[in-house]
């Protein structure tokens, strides 16, 4: 577990600058700090906890212990069909191998017991290793974040998540942020020769009052006040499916092109951050006698390469799409700035 990024030294974390793992790691560490303080507050009034855990001199519980608890669970929990996340003795110690290298699968039998089944056509020699898959479709960032490694056979980052923010000069910005019930960003997924994307949040950035989006304060039957979003006078019940509403609009092609323009600008911004820190990462002293372990440096370099490849592919792919869709729609886009929401 020592290679999980939550255990990396500050100098090692700096190697992740420009990758999608950097903000995810910062958010995770902040979350773990809050959880640890909540644990302290909830238990410090218990005499034995105050003495054994939190005593300033003899207390044995430290933040690193909470990191260990998180790592045990995050790197070993498996999602069992119909049950959810579980830690199963022995099975949770099996190593990962994807594709044809996966020797066994984990299932739940008729009695609700966790079982490990050899895959059809597979054999395991005596004293051989039984491997499972942690998820063949998981991206490089998630694999490094959750398990502390990237498969040698992985040739693509597979997917990545880029955050977005509603621009500060958006007149409806505060209202949009208040009603948004979706992740603030979008996911890019490699799909054959192309790249697909998904993210409801981007549509909040792409439309405004002049398009038909508005907000009103409404009183509920309980007497409370709540903010209600409407699209062309029709209520919007959550923005996860807002795209399907926009697709029915005569100006759908305009909204779609706006979204792709925002997406492309955000990808360009991420590439700039990634390439802008390359020299610093390359020059970082690593190995024995330094603050950067050899393995951490190589993992960071590998992630940077894989994510840059996918970002470059996505930028080129959507540049072609923007050029193809622009033209007759350029006049409609004139007043829309695609750098909105881009960091």
Regions found by a protein language model. Name each.
Residues 117-120:
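Short, conserved secondary-structure segments in the cores of folded domains
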Residues 99, 132-135, 312:
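Residue-level marker of positions within ordered structural domains that often coincide
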Residues 122, 132-140:
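Short, charged beta-turn/beta-strand-edge "cap" motif at the junction between a beta-strand
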Residues 1-109, 114:
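Catalytic cores of histone-lysine modification enzymes
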Residues 138-343:
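Charged low-complexity "KEKE/polyampholyte" interaction tracts
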């Amino acid at each position: 577990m020592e290679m999980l990024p939550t255990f990396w030294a500050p100098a090692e974390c700096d190697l992740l600058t420009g990758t999608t793992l950097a903000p995810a790691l910062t958010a995770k560490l902040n979350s773990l700090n809050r959880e640890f303080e909540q644990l302290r507050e909830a238990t410090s009034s218990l005499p034995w906890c105050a003495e054994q855990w939190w005593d300033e001199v003899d207390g044995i519980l430290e933040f690193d212990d909470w990191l260990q608890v998180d790592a045990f669970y995050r790197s070993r929990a498996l999602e069992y069909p119909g049950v959810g996340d579980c830690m199963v003795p022995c099975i949770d110690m099996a190593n990962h191998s994807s594709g044809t290298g996966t020797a066994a699968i984990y299932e739940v039998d008729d009695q609700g017991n966790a079982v490990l089944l050899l895959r059809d056509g597979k054999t395991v020699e005596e004293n051989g290793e039984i491997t499972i898959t942690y998820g063949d479709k998981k991206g490089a960032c998630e694999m490094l974040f959750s398990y502390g490694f990237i498969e040698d056979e992985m040739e693509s980052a597979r997917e990545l998540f880029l955050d977005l923010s509603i621009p500060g000069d958006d007149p409806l910005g505060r209202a949009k942020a208040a009603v948004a019930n979706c992740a603030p960003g979008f996911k890019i997924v490699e799909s054959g020769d192309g790249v697909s994307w998904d993210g409801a949040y981007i549509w909040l950035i792409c439309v405004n009052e002049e398009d038909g989006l508005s907000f009103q304060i409404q009183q509920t039957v309980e007497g409370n006040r709540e903010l209600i979003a409407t699209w062309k006078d029709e209520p919007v019940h959550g923005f996860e499916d807002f795209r399907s509403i926009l697709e029915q609009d005569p100006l759908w092609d305009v909204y779609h092109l706006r979204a792709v323009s925002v997406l492309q600008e955000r990808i360009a911004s991420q590439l700039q951050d990634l390439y802008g820190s390359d020299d610093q990462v390359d020059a970082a002293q690593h190995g024995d006698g330094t603050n950067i372990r050899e393995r951490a440096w190589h993992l960071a370099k590998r992630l940077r390469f894989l994510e840059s490849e996918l970002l470059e592919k996505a930028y080129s792919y959507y540049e072609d799409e923007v050029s193809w869709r622009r033209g007759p729609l350029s006049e409609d886009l004139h007043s829309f700035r695609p750098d909105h929401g881009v960091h």
